[in-house]
Amino acid sequence: MMKLEMICTGEEVLSGQIVDTNAAWFASTMMEHGIEIQRRVTVGDRLEDLIAVFQERSLHADVILVNGGLGPTSDDMSAEAMAKAKGESLVENREWRQHLEDWFTRNNREMPVSNLKQAMLPESAVMVDNPVGTACGFRVKLNRAWLFFTPGVPFELKHMVKEQFIPFIREEFDLDAKVALKKLLTIGHGESSLADKIEPLELPEGITIGYRSSMPHIEIKIFARGEKAIALLPRVTGHIKMVLGTAVVAEDKATLAEEIHTKLLNSGLTLSVAESCTGGMITSQLVDFPGSSSYLQHGLVTYSNESKVRVLGVNPATLDDHGAVSIPTVEEMAKGARAILDSDFALATSGIAGPDGGTEEKPVGTVAIALATRSGVYSQMIKLPRRSRDLVRSLSAAVAYDMLRRELLTEAVIVDYQSIGRFSK
Amino acid sequence: MMKLEMICTGEEVLSGQIVDTNAAWFASTMMEHGIEIQRRVTVGDRLEDLIAVFQERSLHADVILVNGGLGPTSDDMSAEAMAKAKGESLVENREWRQHLEDWFTRNNREMPVSNLKQAMLPESAVMVDNPVGTACGFRVKLNRAWLFFTPGVPFELKHMVKEQFIPFIREEFDLDAKVALKKLLTIGHGESSLADKIEPLELPEGITIGYRSSMPHIEIKIFARGEKAIALLPRVTGHIKMVLGTAVVAEDKATLAEEIHTKLLNSGLTLSVAESCTGGMITSQLVDFPGSSSYLQHGLVTYSNESKVRVLGVNPATLDDHGAVSIPTVEEMAKGARAILDSDFALATSGIAGPDGGTEEKPVGTVAIALATRSGVYSQMIKLPRRSRDLVRSLSAAVAYDMLRRELLTEAVIVDYQSIGRFSK
């Protein structure tokens, strides 16, 4: 099997001044082609570090994608380091020098002398074209590995990987790309509790399971490698969904908001939202998607009691008798938000996100949630003790979305989730 | 000099399914303490890869922070790999087993058997406490290096680095901690335009400048190393602020929302928000902070025209004559939101976030913003062409916050930002 590694260069990546999105993009693009990266090394702009890492990793990998350090400034030294690592000199690549001169002429600019450096490649390098920038790519064979040098500018990297790198490794290593992936989105279960349920299953050969925590969700990834495993993927997925029950809330979606958005978009159905403790989170996550205006009518973040009365028409006596965090209040909030524009659905939340504001009867993490429809209202009051303010809010939003999702599927709206408690009515 | 490296583990980080924000956070936190990372290696969940990287890097570094792989599932194998790398066995740490049992008892849950694994540490390991999770940290000496193992959950990592790791390296390597840092938050300028203004300044010895892009903000970090430089830091900061003018919107705050929250908290002043294109972002960013209920009365995300009329009292004729994205509409939205609860201030936004919905007259990126006060209303219509939907929304929220910030300082509410255009009224 071909061993692929990545070397990321640049002080700003190593020092955390920028998050390395190139690395994540490259790895997930390779995954989609069925190729796993074995290791990624990130180094700064020090010549001796670069030489050392090229020499060292070229003993272990078959292909190494090197990203960054091809620019015109003094801290761009990938080509020089590669030449030194191989013990050869830098020579001017005529073709690229011509390309640079043409590029600057086309852009009506004079070429700074510093850009000439970008045409200097290690003697044994094979040039790799970059039609979208001034940094020339190249590849060099050292020890076991092909080192493939790419620019740090994201769209130049992407272009070069798609147009040059992938065809190159396909050809060079005769790759078989048969891989499939299914993602299940879950809420209300810890990673270990999900694993305890899944790990006893006997999975067919070629099928592996991964977990990714992205609170309030945990995503389960089912990888299938090879045609036989891919054919079995739907059956395995069905089995896992059965075992996990209400924990699974979406397939191949990143969040419940995306699932709701997809279901409501162009459905002709409309939604209103009244939020207290979730503070705009439910609304905001939907507005993130273009086209949400087709179904989302308004989201009313009625943080104060006065606003619940004035904007949503909650009865002041309800607030007095039951408090803002109560089933009667949140039901009136949902009904009020729905009635203003006669929406098909309205979601409402009211709770104590913390860290302060809890009482013995209603501690921090108590959240009332309601869904109003044209025919009635569903509500529950959940318990999320010992969660951070942010997690109380994001879990509450997830439960609210799930109530609506289940209503849209005409399933029971209120269900138990393993790690989420509930007050009896 | 102490050589610090980082090893990130986890298939989901290596494969790019998640961007490695832990790595960026750790590196920039170390930078703030005056310590540079030399190299970062990212490996997946394969035992032999982990063993190889521990053995190899322990020959080169003095301290290696290892992140991830301490969970209860079968793909968490950092402790096992470390034990194998050192040729010793895993033994149960009684103290941590007790901690786990107490943790689950306190949370009224039965401990899954899989969690027992989290108490198994390499024989020579020194346990490192994790008061905020079930993953036990530890450190092991191998060859030249101390390998320091930390959980992958971001807030557990952060807690352990601050409370345990930094004191440990301080003590072990006798580090000189004389470093100070000032952060300036900016909006409306590109990084190169900020650098063009700052780089001509002659900075005293020991003072260096860093930039961090966290859209819609760019943060400028002014590091001072040594007592002399620290003493000069206020003067240098003042000079840079003068040179940058309206670009600087806060000091030592991560976002403008945090600056507004700090100013309004317990001020006795109240705020209402009416959002259209920003879709709850302004409200939601404030609700993120505990205590925001002391000033935030409500945030009305009036996405549809009907909602602007019914909830905010916008005149239908205004919408007909000028459209939803217009100065008159956004002014009525702000005045309406303020009037409902007689708030001191109200912010309103209405714009075209894209990718669709633009016209020749009002292209994607056109956003009207208003601030209503007890004495009047300020408004402007800005142009944000060629920005993503998300950036149009976050820049609009930032400009709205800045209008309120400037009003609270009794400065001119509407000012020019270099990279943000504006329609003339």
UniProtKB/Swiss-Prot annotation, chains A, B:
Stored Pfam families: CinA (PF02464), MoCF_biosynth (PF00994)
Domain of life: Bacteria
InterPro entries the UniProt entry points to: CinA, CinA-like_C, CinA_C, Competence-induced_CinA, MoaB/Mog-like_dom_sf, MoaB/Mog_dom
Gene3D superfamilies found in the cross-reference section: CinA-like, MoaB/Mog-like domain
SMART domains, sorted: MoCF_biosynth (SM00852)
HAMAP family (UniProt xref): CinA_B
Family statement: Belongs to the CinA family.
Name the record gives this protein: CinA-like protein
Organism, as annotated: Shewanella sp. (strain ANA-3)
